[in-house]
């Protein structure tokens, strides 16, 4: 997997409109995106993921998935399913409504790679700083 560091993708207009209509009071995922979105950038992971090859999923997006997964006490399979079917997760992750998401096996590989490089606390520490 290669990476070109960036921030979270912008929330697509249609995704935002549907999320706001379906959840007028918001949700945990929407609140995290709106108030803490700047924490979930690729930059802290720049040394862990290469720049060659086809781009992989954004480490910033995967770290946001991991935080939402923990907050909602979900398995990897359930978290990957939420990215496909839950409008508030699509909003938080900056996904189009028709986006088919990612395979659940990406999540344990992502966590293992962070642990391999001593970055398992990187997102948590950034959340505390924010």
Language-model-derived ranges and their functions:
Residues 1-37:
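Charged, often Cys/His-bearing segments associated with DNA-binding zinc-finger transcription factors
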Residues 96-130:
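Active-site- or DNA-interface-adjacent structural scaffold in DNA-acting proteins
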Residues 24-67, 71:
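Basic, short loop/linker segments at the boundary and entry of helix-turn-helix/winged-helix-like folds
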């Amino acid at each position: 997997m290669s990476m070109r560091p960036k921030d979270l993708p912008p929330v697509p207009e249609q995704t935002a409109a549907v999320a706001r209509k379906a959840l007028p009071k918001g949700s945990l995922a929407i609140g995290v995106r709106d108030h803490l979105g700047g924490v979930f950038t690729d930059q802290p992971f720049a040394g862990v993921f290469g720049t060659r090859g086809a781009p992989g999923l954004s480490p910033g997006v995967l770290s946001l998935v991991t935080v939402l997964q923990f907050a909602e006490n979900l398995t990897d399979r359930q978290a990957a399913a939420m990215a496909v079917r839950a409008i508030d997760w699509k909003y938080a992750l900056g996904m189009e409504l028709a986006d088919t998401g990612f395979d659940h096996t990406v999540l344990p590989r992502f966590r293992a790679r962070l642990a391999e490089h001593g970055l398992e606390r990187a997102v948590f520490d950034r959340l505390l700083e924010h």
